[in-house]
Curated annotation (Swiss-Prot):
Superkingdom per UniProt: Eukaryota
Name under which the protein is recorded: Glyoxalase domain-containing protein 5
InterPro entries to which the protein is assigned, alphabetical: Glyas_Bleomycin-R_OHBP_Dase (IPR029068), Glyas_Fos-R_dOase_dom (IPR004360), GlyoxalaseI/FosfomycinResist (IPR050383), VOC (IPR037523)
Organism from which the protein derives: Xenopus laevis
Family label: Belongs to the glyoxalase I family.
Domain VOC residue range list: 33-153
Length: 160
């Protein structure tokens, strides 16, 4: 199997400043986990209401009045369209994300809650493959039409 850097060099034009990375060597570090991601949204209030009331996340405010949604040891930082913070993605676009969120709550309970909240289920429950094993998932959309997958690991030892 070829290293990612070598695959990139064959399939895409690699910027010249990355040419030193194109050897078979690995970086001198290892990524451990995702700390946060950024969603660009059309309306902060609608997004916060959805993620807190429908998905049970906690709304937080940090530096300079910025908004985030916390869950577990991760968070989702929110940027409002046209008011993004720098640095930002090249093309910050509402509705372009596809997120998989893990819960220990049985999906039957999740589905019942989604129905009470009036949130349509796009698909599921269906079997999928998560980062560390098999999962069962339901799919829904947030107010910006991002695809949200809520999942249970099939084995209890894969929960964290």
């Amino acid at each position: 199997m070829l290293p990612l850097c070598r695959l990139l060099s064959r399939r895409a034009q690699v910027p010249s400043h990355l040419s030193r990375c194109l050897s078979d060597s690995r970086p001198p570090f290892r990524i451990q986990r995702l700390d946060h991601l950024v969603l660009t949204v059309r309306n902060l209030d609608k997004t916060i209401k959805f993620y807190t009331k429908v998905l049970g996340m906690e709304a937080t405010t940090f530096k300079g009045g910025r908004k985030a949604l916390s869950f577990g040891i991760q968070k989702i930082n929110l940027h409002e369209t046209g008011k993004e913070f720098e640095p930002k993605a090249s093309l910050p676009t509402p509705g372009s994300a596809d997120l998989c969120l893990i819960t220990e709550t049985p999906l039957t309970t999740v589905v019942q809650h989604l129905k009470v909240c009036g949130v349509p289920i796009e698909e599921g429950p269906v079997s999928r493959t998560g980062a560390v094993g098999e999962i069962t998932s339901v799919y829904l959309r947030d107010p910006d039409h991002n695809l949200i997958e809520v999942s249970n690991y099939e084995s209890n030892d894969k929960k964290n």
